[in-house]
Amino acid sequence: MDLLYIKTIVDKRCNLDVSLPVVLGVSGGPDSLFLLEVFVQLGFPVVVAHFNHHLRPEADSEVRTVEQMAKIRKCPFFFGESDVKAEAVSNKRSIEEQARISRYYFLFHAADEVNAQAVAVAHTADDQVETILMHFLRGSGLNGLAGMPFRSEEHGWNSTKPLVRPLLETWREEIEMYCHEKGLTPLRDPSNLDSQYYRNRIRNELIPLLEDFNPKLKEHILNLSQIVQDELAAKKSEILDVWVRVLAHQDESQLVIHTSELRKLELAFQRQVLRKIQMILAPEFRNLDFVTVERMIHNIQIPFSSASQDWIAGIHYFQTRKAVIFYRGNELPLDYESPQIIKKSREWDIGSILSLANGWKLKGEIIS
């Protein structure tokens, strides 16, 4: 195991400062235990954060085990929990998706509590391959084929703290070997063998089958991820320019997009705009597929309808003559194009002109 190479990734790709604290998501399994070892050896002020999903009988005892892992290494320990199964039913999500959402909310809350510079998780090269295959099977675009980045600023969980994944080029087999050589005893999650979970079926059934066709399948998929990430990075400034052109208005409740500007874009950029809208309004949603994107592109081309319609993940939209307005929640936002008074109360002398939002002006006179 080349720890010097991982240090280079932590420094250059994750862009972390060794003098500032980092919250580590630690389940106690081989990957996260290895991540904890690496960060302690590199000299980071480490905060160990463990989340109990209450999905398995042994989950409570695992909390104590991970707490002991932190104590041995003289690291502060944060603990969170929720009834993920009940939340999944209530929110109409899969257990996998709800577990991920609940866990990340907890991790970034812990990062805020200790003023950490980042949250680090132990996704490996194997996890990257599985993620890309999942995206591919769901009909993803280039963003899905890019997989997970080493450092993510726009993850949706926290606007100021990045999510970093230092182990994306480290294979699970290497980690297992390291744990064995160092006498480390990680926890084992039996649910990793349960085929009712989609990722497990990818890992335990699909990948071995595909490796019969090409034994270097995983290495090739990892290379594909890097190629796509580099391509997207090269186009980043161009995509930003497009976003500036189409965005009419943004606040905490809505995104307003210039319909005419959106329609003028090449199809590839229209797709990028829609994926960015989804990332801003529903960052926890990961299954934006080709059909959903194409249907929205088609809807935007037809004459406007003032009726609010559902899109995905609790995002709704309606069209005006000049814009399409995306929002989340049950409350219909104000029509951006209509005259609005921004402040709740405002003095106005009858006879004078009052400037409103969006270039509107209000003028009054007394008629006797």
What feature does the model see in each segment?
Residues T124, E176-E219, N223-Q226, S308, ...:
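Mid-to-C-terminal catalytic subdomains of enzymes
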Residues D2-P30, F44-V47, F51, S82-V84, ...:
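AMP-forming adenylation/ATP pyrophosphatase catalytic core
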Residues E58, A99, L167, W171, ...:
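Catalytic cores of large soluble enzymes that bind and process phosphate-bearing ligands
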Residues M1-P208, S237:
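Core alpha/beta nucleotide-donor-binding catalytic domains of modification enzymes
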